[in-house]
Structures are given as structure tokens and as C-alpha cells.
Amino acid sequence: MSHVELQPGFDFQQAGKEVLAIERECLAELDQYINQNFTLACEKMFWCKGKVVVMGMGKSGHIGRKMAATFASTGTPSFFVHPSEAAHGDLGMVTPQDVVIAISNSGESSEITALIPVLKRLHVPLICITGRPESSMARAADVHLCVKVAKEACPLGLAPTSSTTATLVMGDALAVALLKARGFTAEDFALSHPGGALGRKLLLRVNDIMHTGDEIPHVKKTASLRDALLEVTRKNLGMTVICDDNMMIEGIFTDGDLRRVFDMGVDVRQLSIADVMTPGGIRVRPGILAVEALNLMQSRHITSVMVADGDHLLGVLHMHDLLRAGVV
């Protein structure tokens, strides 16, 4: 396209709002297509013993990829297959235990219609999503989901806009309906998103990130305050645990306790750790979620916490560990 000048006074905001208005109207009309066919499609996907295989060409293919990804992350195993690649060997990935969702606004995609006889021969259930109930794909489908729109938001009526939005929303409707039917939980979602923030919050446990072994700052009750301070400095966690030879907790001493000792105006060189430690101390179990430990630490205004099984010291968790793990 050759370079053109911007029309004086052209209103980009108005143009954008017109698109939103058109697509809102189209989505409102989509409600009529959440019907018995929608129920049948959901049932086929719910009882599918294999995977939901999504196909689509061009823009429908882009929507199909997103649809498959949404299914897969919400409890419905799914993957995308490009129709052209399917015709040259990738159809071998499809089994009779699967369900195929084929997407085409016109319902006449030659790449997909060429695959339908093979899918029928394999007895693979076929769900077609099109904008034309009278199309070849709609008539060949076991279940047809209509996503017909009154007009595209593109003023030329050429670029897929309203139609792709309608298809995307229909896919979301299928995914969320199945999610609810399966009783899919946030914890289930986290299992497929271990690298995301939600995954870290719902999967990461204290024993995954706590300090253990030689990294644990600890001294005996008979230690001097000086020796305890050296241990605090060496381990760099802002605290030390006071425990016996069997790692049974007797108390804790933090940098906050040290400030209080200085405020007392006593000779710190003459003190033992037993004189200034806090008996007992707050602790958490190793198997709790890291985010639970974070909530406790924030509510108690502490930066570190002991990890223990009863009184037996197992580790120490610091706020910095939670930050590094991405829990905060």
C-alpha cells in the first residue's frame, strides 16, 4: 500500500469505540447459540478418554491455538494440529479416543473438509465451529456450534474481527463450562502453571526453600551473647536459634532483641544468650505452603521464622527466601 496522508481531524478514539460497539452487539447475539448443541459438545469433551484436538486455518488457526491452550490449562487435555500438516502425516496423532474441534468461519475450509472423511473412518467425534449452519463442515459435524455474526468490525467486511472474537468467546465458554463440571480448582490450575506466580503460591512449600543443615544459625543456651552475635553474623539471617544438642528449640534471638539489649544499657560482654533470648518463639511446619508462612510473618511483623516439627528444629525461613522464590 502506498503512503497516504492522515486525514485532518481523524478520530482514532471514535474508530476504536465503533469496533467495540460492533463486537459487543455480536457477542450479545452469541447467547442464542449456547443451546443444546453446546451441551452436546461439552458432554463429548467431558467424556473424552483421549485429548481434544483443535484445528483451524489462518486466523481461525490462531484462535484454535489459544483455545487448545485454554482447554489444556483448565483440565481438558488438548493440543492444536495445523490442517495442512495433518494432511501430511500429523493426523496420525489423532486417535478414536480423541475429539476434534474444527474451526472455520465460512465452514468451507478445503484443508479441513479434506480431512473429514478420514476422521469419519476413524470414528473420531467431530465438533465444528462455523458462522454458517448450512456449510459443508456444519453438515458433516457430529455437533455444530454456530458463531454467526451480523457484521465484521472491519469497515470493508474483510478482516476477521467480530467473527474471530465470537469464536474465541465460544471457546472460552466451552473451557469454563468444563472447568466447572470437573470441579477444577486453583490448585489444579497451579499444577499446569508451576512457573507462574499462582503456581509458586499454590505449590511451593516451606521445606522447598528453607535453610537447613549448616545454614541454620543456632547456638547452645550456655553460649555467650558475643558468640551468639557471631553466629547471627556468619549465617546472615538476622537471628539465631537457641537449642540443645538434639536440636530441640529453647528460644530465639533476633536483631530486634539485640536493639532492646542495647537500650537496657547493660554490659553486653557479661551476658549469656540465656539472659536475653526469647523463650520458645514462633515456628511453622515444613509442609505448609510458603505463602502461608509469608502471611504469618507479615501478620507478626517478623522477617524470619523457625521451621520445626514440634520443638525439633528443622530449618529457618527468611523473608528474602520468599522474595527469591517469587512468593512475595
Swiss-Prot record:
Pathway: Carbohydrate biosynthesis; 3-deoxy-D-manno-octulosonate biosynthesis; 3-deoxy-D-manno-octulosonate from D-ribulose 5-phosphate: step 1/3; Bacterial outer membrane biogenesis; lipopolysaccharide biosynthesis
Single GO biological process annotation from the record: lipopolysaccharide biosynthetic process
Molecular function terms, GO-annotated: arabinose-5-phosphate isomerase activity; carbohydrate derivative binding; metal ion binding
Residues bound to substrate: 75-76, 82, 88, 114-123, 148-150, 222, 275
Protein keywords: Carbohydrate metabolism, CBS domain, Isomerase, Lipopolysaccharide biosynthesis, Metal-binding, Repeat, Zinc
Sequence ranges assigned to domain CBS in this UniProt record: 210-268, 277-328
Binding positions for Zn(2+) per the UniProt entry: 82
Reactions this protein catalyses: D-arabinose 5-phosphate = D-ribulose 5-phosphate
Record's keyword annotation contains Isomerase: yes
Residues in SIS domain copies: 42-184
Residues of the site described as Catalytically relevant: 59, 111, 152, 193
Entry keyword Nuclease: no
E.C. number(s) listed in UniProt: 5.3.1.13
Similarity comment text for this entry: Belongs to the SIS family. GutQ/KpsF subfamily.
Protein's job: Involved in the biosynthesis of 3-deoxy-D-manno-octulosonate (KDO), a unique 8-carbon sugar component of lipopolysaccharides (LPSs). Catalyzes the reversible aldol-ketol isomerization between D-ribulose 5-phosphate (Ru5P) and D-arabinose 5-phosphate (A5P).
Subunit annotation: Homotetramer.
Name of this protein: Arabinose 5-phosphate isomerase KdsD
Lineage: Bacteria, Pseudomonadati, Pseudomonadota, Gammaproteobacteria, Enterobacterales
Gene: kdsD
